[in-house]
Amino acid sequence: MRYKNIAVLMTALDSESQAVELKGIEEFGKSRGYNIAVFVWYTGAFEKEKHNTGEVNIVNLPDLSLFDGVIVFSNVFHIEKNRQLIEDALDKLTCPIVCIGCRLKDYYSIHTDNYTAMRKLVEHFVVDHKVKDIHFVKGIEGNEDAAERYRAFEDVMREHNLPILPERISQGDFYV
């Protein structure tokens, strides 16, 4: 019997949530007789471009076409150039691909509905607590999840005729 081989692409192995998710993947794989190969690199939102490019190129080291499936953690996509490099590598594959934490092309995905979650949170402050002066901290520019959260904030504020003042909007440096 041939074992199934699953590749996991991720960064931030030091992230508690990803360590827990990876442990779950490994335990499930072991219980089913799958081989799990984890490819980890470090790319940070504040690193030098050459560093990020070099690190993300680790995805090109294994021959991903030899795997029966690929799992991709979304934190690899917080830099657009990295996203494109990963997409290029994945586009060549015929095996199932699952993205955790993001939507990517037509691949299977497990992700959070950031818009609905933020909308409910802002509505809770505005309706239940009668808060009118809200300071919003945005995520990294160009991050789809951050944009969805900010759009939800704007929508609720407008629906309740509350001001969205530039001095109450801060640019954050996080991507999750």
Predicted features by range, described:
Residues M1-K48, G54-V176:
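Bacterial carbohydrate/catabolite-sensing allosteric modules
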